[in-house]
Curated annotation (Swiss-Prot):
This is Cytosine-containing mismatch-binding protein 1. Its main location: nucleus. Residues 123-197 bind DNA. GO terms for cellular component: mitochondrial nucleoid; mitochondrion; nucleus. GO terms for biological process: mitochondrial chromosome packaging; transcription initiation at mitochondrial promoter.
Amino acid sequence: MVFAIRIRQFHTTLVSAEKNGLQKLIPPRLKTIWNQMLVETKGAGNGPERFEMIRQKYKALTADEIQKYKNKLQEQFDAEKKRFMETLRSFTPTEIDSENRRRSKEAHSTGSRYYRLRHPDVPKKPSSAFILFYKELRNNPKLRQELGIPEAISTLVEETQNASKAWKELAEDKKKPFIDKSKALKEQYDKFMKEAGFR
């Protein structure tokens, strides 16, 4: 039973064997020197021998050699990321949204994690008035002092709760700048989406 569950978790959208290119699309990751050395020593001895070989090889690297490895891996990552973004652009935002919903549903049913795709040319959705207020609160000590919110908050949950309470108690004239800015950002977003043909 456990084996069956693991197979289901592996066969998620992130590694799907289906023909749909969007379903198989996963973002590149920046490889480590260890990853690269595993590739370079493929077929060289059994597991323990190979790992010891890599350990000794890494231990003997000079600072310049380590930097060369890092530069090479960064170049590979940049090239892979560029290809990834170009591939994403070949799909419409609607297709990507549909795929994200499918991934979410499948991940929920298997208990797996999934990567949410995002069209490179679509801007992030504008922040709500409360989120704009929350960001200002985090970066403005004077505002925190005015609202009686202490500087040091132990947890993010407590920080959010304090911000939510402060927002609810905030006078309407104090809320207005955040509400107006949120509306303006929403209008800009909607205009861009329409002009770009994403709606």
